[in-house]
């Protein structure tokens, strides 16, 4: 039997102002200052009184105005509070009165008790709000609905867990009725059913009330069971199970399915290829494609328990291509888009749900907003730290349409999510949305790149929970403290300190923007090949890593330890990457010195032995990290994509093993007075450079040469429609054939091996594009190399023609005139050789350069971080 025990000690006002409870560092202060309590989200109103309390929850509460089934549902969560152990005050008088938990308006005596302390709040708490009274006379949780009582119990749970010992009055309600997390499970990590249940439990405690998933192909409907990956999917019965589980925690699961673009995964399955207008876009006019969408969306609508369904339909880059070209040419892109969305709207409405859709296309084509049904909810997304979010709200707010703001947590092509950007974006977009009557907040977690763990995202999830419940910026100062006590049961600040120490790597050139290019780059070149390594800022990075290590080692969580393990892993991963680069360069230098001097002395043998040991130690560290990551992945995710994310580990381990074997062979040759082979021949073709080589480009082609001896005369396309600087996914046209511009990142430190990317038979033309943003007008020296003929263009002007160098070490120098703003760089390369075609490009060393993908910035006055 549960028993409530309350102990009360009266303290003077002067004593109160200097008293912390439970030695946890929570200082009692007046309301409307920087006062705080260990609750997240921070309540809208709270006020401490003079009583100091010690209480435990061991008795069933007195239920007021609740049906039997509602009592049973809430009792499940009440018992979770009762299970918490905490310290009570010594020498306190014991009081055994019970908590009263009830619905307002059902019991006059209960209403009167609540009104004595909180009459001014009763009409403000809304459907999801609650009132919590905790003092010597009253132990009350009151609300107008069952879900409000649930949220009141969650607040009590957090107070109890933190060892709260003050009399307090809380009146609380959400700023937004709809507070959702949207988790990407289609780019690699797809959570297990058990882990999703843990997500539900933890999110519900912080008053998140909707969970959804970004789904392209990882759902297995009964009508079409053959497109989902065998080892990574959610089945319809599993979704129903999860919906029922979410309902126990007063949450709902929102169905989501990409219903226009981003369809490549399904269309790549042979039996579904005919449904595509292009390789990435499902046909909006094919009856079989429409039937497919009706089937899949229908099953999903019935399985997900929320009253909404999100059809996505963002980034429809191919609309107007393939089989949609004639239709778009005839009707216009907005009409074709709107017609497909109206079809989807009818499907959703048939299943009794409200349609959600992304807002990027309507922002670019506002006329579509006047073509679509008015009950659609638009999800307008922007993930950057912007000074204003008006651009992303105005098209919807000005028309009084239903819309929700969608900030983001971006793992996207990063080593760890950028929590500086995420925190500012979530807070800024949410506050802007509150002012412009947005109806909800949906934080979208993106995993492009695929090698991520959700346990690295929780800080951003808690920022979402707080910002969507309470938009008051005065709560920001205490957020980190409340986050730690509620996530980890700690008061030392060390997780947050470690997290934001690691975030300092955003500013260091070698780790700029937390880009995962550092991890994807080859550790060692192939035999006979070369790898460029720039270690100029390596020691700066190591200092930051050491700071983060110090904090994470002292975190000492009492719960949710996987968050700490994931951050700790990221720190270890950064350390081994930086140290590997330094050690490999040193070993390559050792070997080159031995080779050039042809020394067979004992000193050379000793040097090689030492280098072999260094390689062996590195190998063991990579093997250990691989095992650690694999276990962490399987703790959260299904088997799907694990082989892909382990591949960089395996390549590094294999390369190190091969190098150790080659070094041992060289050692034996020296011992036997034999000659040794070149560094390049054993995989040590390392070139250390202080230059910033451009590693990220957009490529298109290969265009067949046939009888053409000279480069095509056009810049970007031989048709006016496409002859413009490209964005990812754009097309170019050559001799009547379409080619797509694709993102490319060098794994060789800036040596772009076109034969690896385009192994098609030569000869052919390949185009490479990037842009360079400059804050001022300037002229800079550029250095380029290519073992094939190359032309260089800057802002449409040819600055070098028919250039060819002996190898990547030999460069030609050209002057580039940069205007203020965006400068377009285009390289045209003629790929003649069947097995070898490379180029490099860099600017003079005294220029400070940063980049995000193919977008480069010169001498930035302020650092910018791209939200992609």
Where are these regions (language model features)?
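Bacterial N-terminal signal peptides
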Residues: 1-9
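Substrate-binding groove of N-acetylhexosamine-processing glycoside hydrolases
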Residues: 28, 32-49, 54-55, 64-67, ...
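Beta-strand-rich ligand-recognition modules
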Residues: 793-841
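Acidic, contiguous N-terminal accessory segments
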Residues: 13-147, 151, 155, 159-171, ...
């Amino acid at each position: 039997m549960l028993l409530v025990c309350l102990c009360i000690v009266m303290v003077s006002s002067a004593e109160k102002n200097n008293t912390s409870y439970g030695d946890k560092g929570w200082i009692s202060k007046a309301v409307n200052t920087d006062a705080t309590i260990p609750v997240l989200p921070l309540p809208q109103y709270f006020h401490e009184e003079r009583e100091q309390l010690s209480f435990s929850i061991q008795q069933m509460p007195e239920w007021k105005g609740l049906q039997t089934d509602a009592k049973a549902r809430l009792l499940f969560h009440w018992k979770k509070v009762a299970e918490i152990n905490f310290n009570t005050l010594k020498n306190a008088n014991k009081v055994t009165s019970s908590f009263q938990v009830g619905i307002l308006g059902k019991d006059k005596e209960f209403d009167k008790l609540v009104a004595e302390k909180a009459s001014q709040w009763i009409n403000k708490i809304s459907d999801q709000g609650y009132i919590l009274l905790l003092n010597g006379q009253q132990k009350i949780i009151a609300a107008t609905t069952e879900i409000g009582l649930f949220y009141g119990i969650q607040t009590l749970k957090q107070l109890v867990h933190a060892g709260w010992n003050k009399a307090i009055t809380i009146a609380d309600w959400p700023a937004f009725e709809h507070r959702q997390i949207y988790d990407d499970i289609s780019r690699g990590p797809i959570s297990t059913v058990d882990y999703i249940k843990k997500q539900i439990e933890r999110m519900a405690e912080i008053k998140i009330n909707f969970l959804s998933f970004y789904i392209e192909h990882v759902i297995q409907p009964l009508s079409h069971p053959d497109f989902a990956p065998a080892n990574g999917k959610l089945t319809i019965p599993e979704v129903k199970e999860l919906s029922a589980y979410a309902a126990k925690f007063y949450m709902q699961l929102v169905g989501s399915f990409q219903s226009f673009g981003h369809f490549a995964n399904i269309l790549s399955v042979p039996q579904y290829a005919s449904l595509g207008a292009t390789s990435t876009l499902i046909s909006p006019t094919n009856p079989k494609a429409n039937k497919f969408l009706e089937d899949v969306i229908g099953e999903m609508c019935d399985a997900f328990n929320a009253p909404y369904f999100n059809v996505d339909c963002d980034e429809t880059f191919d609309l107007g291509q393939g089989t949609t070209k004639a239709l778009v040419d005839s009707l216009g892109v907005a009409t074709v888009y709107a017609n497909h969305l109206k079809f989807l709207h009818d499907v959703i409405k048939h299943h009794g749900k409200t349609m959600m859709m992304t807002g990027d296309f309507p922002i670019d084509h506002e006329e579509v907003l006047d073509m679509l049904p008015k009950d659609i909810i638009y999800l307008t997304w922007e993930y950057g730290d912007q000074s204003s979010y008006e651009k992303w709200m105005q098209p919807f707010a000005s028309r009084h349409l239903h819309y929700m703001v969608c900030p983001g947590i971006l793992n996207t092509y990063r080593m760890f999510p950028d929590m500086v950007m995420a925190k500012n974006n979530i807070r800024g977009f949410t506050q802007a949305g509150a002012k412009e009557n947005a109806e909800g907040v949906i934080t979208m977690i993106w995993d492009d790149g695929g090698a991520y763990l959700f346990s690295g995202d929780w800080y951003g999830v808690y920022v979402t929970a707080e910002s969507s419940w309470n938009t008051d910026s005065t709560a920001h100062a205490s957020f980190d403290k409340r986050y730690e006590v509620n996530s980890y049961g700690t008061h030392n600040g060390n997780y947050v300190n470690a997290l934001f120490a690691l975030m300092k790597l955003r500013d260091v050139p070698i780790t700029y923007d937390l880009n995962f290019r550092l991890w994807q780059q080859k550790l060692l070149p192939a035999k006979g090949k070369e790898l460029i390594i720039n270690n100029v800022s390596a020691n700066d990075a190591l200092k930051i890593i050491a700071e983060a290590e110090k904090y994470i080692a002292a975190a000492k969580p009492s719960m949710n330890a996987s968050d700490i393990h994931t951050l700790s892993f990221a720190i270890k991963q950064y350390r081994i990457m930086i140290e590997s680069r330094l050690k490999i360069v040193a070993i390559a230098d050792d070997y080159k010195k031995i080779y050039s001097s042809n020394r067979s002395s004992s000193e050379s043998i000793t040097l090689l032995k030492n280098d072999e040991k260094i390689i062996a130690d590195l190998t063991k560290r990579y093997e250990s990290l691989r095992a650690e990551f694999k276990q962490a992945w399987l703790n959260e995710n299904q088997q799907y994509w694990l082989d892909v994310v382990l591949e960089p580990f395996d390549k590094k381990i294999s390369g190190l093993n091969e190098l150790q074997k080659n070094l041992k062979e060289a050692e034996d040759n020296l011992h036997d007075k034999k000659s040794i082979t070149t560094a390049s021949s054993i995989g040590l073709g390392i070139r250390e450079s202080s230059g910033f080589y451009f590693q990220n480009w957009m490529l298109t082609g290969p265009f067949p040469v046939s009888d053409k001896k000279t480069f095509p005369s056009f810049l970007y396309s031989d048709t006016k429609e496409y002859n413009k600087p490209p964005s990812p996914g754009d097309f170019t046209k050559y001799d009547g054939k379409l080619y797509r511009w694709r993102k490319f990142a060098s794994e060789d430190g800036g040596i772009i091996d076109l034969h690896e990317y385009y192994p098609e038979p030569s000869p052919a033309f390949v185009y490479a594009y990037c842009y360079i943003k400059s804050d001022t007008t300037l002229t800079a020296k550029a250095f380029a190399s290519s073992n094939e003929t190359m032309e260089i263009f800057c802002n449409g002007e040819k600055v070098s023609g028919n250039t060819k160098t002996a190898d990547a070490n030999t460069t030609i120098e050209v002057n580039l005139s940069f205007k203020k703003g965006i400068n377009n760089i285009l390289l045209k390369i003629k790929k003649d050789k069947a097995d070898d075609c490379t180029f490099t490009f860099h600017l003079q060393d005294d220029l400070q350069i940063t980049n995000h993908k193919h977008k480069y910035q010169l001498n930035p006055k302020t650092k910018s971080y791209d939200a992609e």
